[in-house]
C-alpha cells in the first residue's frame, strides 16, 4: 500500500483503488449511490435527495481543514478510470485511540471485493497513520454482504444489539438490529 500525504489532500492507494478527499465535483457520483433506495437500504441514512448529497459533500470539504481533524471520509475511486464508486470513512473517537470504520459502495460495483479492499486499506491507514488502538465497525444485521466484509478483514464479532437503530427504510422508519465488530492494532 502506498500512503501519500501532502498539505492539500490525503491519498492512499490499494491494488485497484484510489482513496482521495472529496471535492465539489463529486455530487453527481455520490448521488448515484446515496440517492438510491436499494443502495442505502441497510444504512442509518438515505436514500438522500440531491440537496442532502450536496450538504454531505460540503461537510466533507469543511472537515478536510478542521484541526484537529477527526473525520477522514474518502471517495473510493477505481484507480484505472478515476470513477468514484463509494466512500470509506474513519471516524476518530474523542479519546484519540479508538475509531469507527464506515463505508458505502455503489450497487453497480457490489460483489467485486472493492469494499473489502478499501476497508483493509483504511484499517491500515488508521493503525499506521493515526496510531489507533482499536477500530470498530457495525452493520445492519440483515446486511450479509457487509457482515462478510468485516469477517474477511479479520474483525472480531463483538455482539448484536437488537432493535438498536431507528432507520428510514424506503419510505418508512423501523427499528433494526446491528452487528458490532472490532479489530485491535495488535491483532
Residue ranges, per PLM feature:
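Acyl-donor (CoA/ACP) binding surface of acyl/acetyltransferases
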Residues: 1-38, 58, 75-187
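Conserved GNAT-fold acetyl-CoA-binding loop/helix
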Residues: 38-61, 74
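Short loop/turn motifs at secondary-structure junctions and domain boundaries
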Residues: 64-69
